[in-house]
UniProtKB/Swiss-Prot annotation:
With LigD forms a non-homologous end joining (NHEJ) DNA repair enzyme, which repairs dsDNA breaks with reduced fidelity. Binds linear dsDNA with 5'- and 3'- overhangs but not closed circular dsDNA nor ssDNA. Recruits and stimulates the ligase activity of LigD. Keywords: DNA damage, DNA recombination, DNA repair, DNA-binding. GO terms for molecular function: double-stranded DNA binding. Residues 10-175 form the Ku domain. InterPro entries: Ku70/Ku80_beta-barrel_dom, Prok_Ku, SPOC-like_C_dom_sf. This is Non-homologous end joining protein Ku. Homodimer. Interacts with LigD. Residues 226-270 are annotated as: Disordered. GO terms for biological process: DNA recombination; double-strand break repair via nonhomologous end joining. It comes from the Bacteria. Residues 226-242 have a biased composition (Basic and acidic residues). Residues 243-254 have a biased composition (Acidic residues). It comes from Actinosynnema mirum (strain ATCC 29888 / DSM 43827 / JCM 3225 / NBRC 14064 / NCIMB 13271 / NRRL B-12336 / IMRU 3971 / 101).
Amino acid sequence: MRATWRGSVTVGLVSFPVRLTPVRQERGVRLHQVHRVDGGRVRHRRVCELCGEELEAADLARGHDSGAGVVLVEDEELAGLRALPSRAVEVVQFSPAGQVDPVLLGRAYYLEPEEPGTGSYSVLREVLERGGLVGIARVPLRGREVVAVVRPRGGVLVLQVLVWAEEVREPDFVVPVAVSGERELGLAASLVGAMTEDFDPAAFPDAYSAGLTRVVADKLAGQRLERQERQRREAGEVRQADETDEAAETEVPEVDIPASRAPGETGGELLAALRRSLERLRGGRR
């Protein structure tokens, strides 16, 4: 896997080199906006909504619309807010894994050890796993500092970026307290027990992506068939033209040739055979 970031993990005075690689991989078919007529990609131009002028990169700035006006923020001002050019996953504390609300968990990366840090890496992973702990770390990513958890996953360590606490909304609704009888609770517990099993993420495939891949593959196959049919048709027209020229030169009279049909085959029999074939195909897919 291609590394997104290279640096080190620091815990107190202990430090070892690592590299970050995304846990999630891009997969499936990607769709783009295209011109329906010729398939050309649609490009979006940068146009000012006030004057209608198309802008170049040098004309662009960042700004915040406060309602009373637009406040421009210059690149130099943003540079002062960005993370220092550190290359360290600085673990600042350890906490019980159960105290990290799953709502806070964001994108995840594998922490891959690099020599000579495999020993320290393995010790940290084992300590976290035995203690049911996660490390809370500050990490410079994509030009700004983020907070992340470092946790064991199987035989490796995973760094998972946390959403900022102030970005999490509390529910703005109240659920009325309902009094549940023992019978209802017992039935619910029985239902939940009957449906309880070990979670296997592979048992829940991405049906949309698989379906989209099939749609695109079928269309590509259809295009190939159409192209082959067109080539055969064009080749047949060329042969027919050559034969016509030869017939004209030798003055061979035209002969009407009746359309051929398989022996004993009638239009109704063919239709019935097609229906039976389709029913057999459908039955095989059930």
